[in-house]
A protein has these predicted regions:
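N-terminal [4Fe-4S]-dependent radical SAM core
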Residues: 2-30, 38-40, 250-261, 265, ...
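Canonical Radical SAM [4Fe-4S] cluster-binding loop centered on the CxxxCxxC motif
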Residues: 19-59, 72
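Residue-level signature of catalytic and energy-coupling elements of molecular machines
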Residues: 31, 194, 285
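Glycine-centered loop/turn positions within well-structured domains
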Residues: 37, 139-140, 271, 297
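Secreted/processed peptides and extracellular or luminal domains of membrane proteins
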Residues: 41, 45-48, 213, 219, ...
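Radical SAM/AdoMet-radical enzyme domain recognition
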Residues: 56-79, 83-197
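Radical SAM enzyme [4Fe-4S]-AdoMet core and its adjacent flexible, acidic
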Residues: 140-143, 148-263, 267, 311
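Flexible mid-to-C-terminal extensions adjoining Fe-S/redox cofactors in radical SAM and related proteins
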Residues: 268-372
Length: 372
């Protein structure tokens, strides 16, 4: 075995930077691409395909990916879906990831429908935090959004996680109908931070048009007065008593009378690409350097055969390096200056090449196919 190989897989982990100088230390892993809800902005066809298990990452494969990632200095891992609690071994997966040297935090994003029955096991497995996707606390509106009358299950899940001592945050995808004040009061009652997320201009989100700062801060200002912006660079102050797992894109605000933080995640109106620190693995085992791009890369080609785990680690490390180096400087969600080339076969032997604007490509994508 070569010296270079030994160094790559058994040497001390180092900090991995992309070609724009950003340190990449955070990985989101979509462990399954099916979901037990059918949210209109995620699955606009209004069918039940979200419930079908198409791709699932095995525990063994996830552990291989995490081990390789830690060798590149990636230390924070978030498990997503689809709905990750549909994965039959999700509790075991969390437990095994936590045992890998170099892992600083493991978190999970869920719709919380199944959280009540998993909360205790996840706590015992060592989960560091859970983000709950919840867009309304009105039962009829919840059913309208998700096509399922399951709000009570979500609330039970949130309560169970909090009772187990798990740090919970609430994520809200902003729409024109979002009741900002009601959701913030609910989060405050539960003692959980809340983050309002700008909908990506993908699929149904292409025509959403809600400006997060105006909608959220404007609504809360009328009730709680002028907010105080929290310096997101001062992580030690913000996360006093917490781990450093939420070193993400949220801008946080505090309000008089609220003992929680209110966060905004604005992919378009508060573009944060220059500080992006993450990379994504899809449920079919591919690497996605950026959500704003339809480009994905092979993690481990199916044709690869390995003599041992060390060799497999080396291949995954090299794939991760390539994906990080390919990470674009910024997303192009609404950029008509960026084009993709689409090649299709015609009825004859000839092929047809079409130039598509990035904004057109994103408008045609389904959010459910991107991953959580």
């Amino acid at each position: 075995m070569s010296v270079r190989f030994l160094t790559a897989v058994s040497g001390r982990a180092f900090n991995m930077h992309d070609r724009f100088g950003r340190e990449i230390d955070y990985m989101r892993i979509s462990v399954i691409d099916s979901c037990n809800l059918n949210c209109y902005y995620c699955n606009p066809q209004d069918n039940n395909k979200n419930c079908q298990v198409i791709n699932t990452l095995s525990v063994k494969k996830v552990l291989c990916i995490v081990r390789a990632a830690t060798r590149l200095g990636i230390t924070h891992f978030r498990l997503t879906g689809g709905e990750p609690l549909l994965h039959p071994q999700i509790d075991e997966m969390v437990s095994q990831i936590k045992k890998i040297p170099g892992v600083r935090s493991v978190s999970l994003t869920t719709n919380a429908v199944l959280l009540a029955q998993h909360a205790k096991q996840l706590k015992e497995a060592g989960i560091d935090s859970i983000n709950v996707s919840l867009d309304t606390i009105d039962a009829s509106e919840y059913e309208h959004i998700t096509k399922k009358p399951l709000l009570h299950k979500v609330e039970q899940g949130i309560d169970a996680a909090i009772e187990c001592g798990i740090r919970v945050k609430i994520n809200v995808v902003l729409t024109p109908q979002t009741d900002v004040v009601a959701l913030t009061r609910y989060a405050s009652k539960k003692g959980t931070d809340i983050r309002f997320i700008e909908m990506m201009p993908v699929g149904e989100g292409h025509t959403n048009g809600v400006k997060p700062y105006e909608k959220v801060i404007g609504a809360l200002l009328e009730v709680y007065g002028t907010p105080c912006h929290i310096d997101t660079e001062n992580r030690e102050e913000i996360n006093s008593g917490y781990n450093n797992a939420d070193n993400g894109p949220a801008e946080y605000y505090s309000f008089h009378g609220l003992d929680i933080r209110v966060g905004l995640i604005q992919a378009i109106h508060g573009k944060f690409c220059d500080t992006c620190n993450r990379i994504r693995v899809t449920a079919d085992g591919r690497l996605m350097p950026c959500l704003g791009s339809s480009v994905t890369m092979d993690l481990v080609p199916d044709s690869c055969e390995f003599t041992d785990d060390l060799e497999k680690d080396f291949v995954i490390v090299q794939a991760l390096k390539a994906a990080i180096k390919a990470k674009p400087g910024c997303h192009n969600f609404n950029d008509n200056a960026v084009t993709y080339t689409k090649t299709t076969e015609t009825k004859t032997v000839e092929t047809k090449t079409t130039e598509l604007k990035a904004a057109e490509v994103n408008a045609a994508r389904n959010m459910s196919r991107i991953g959580g």
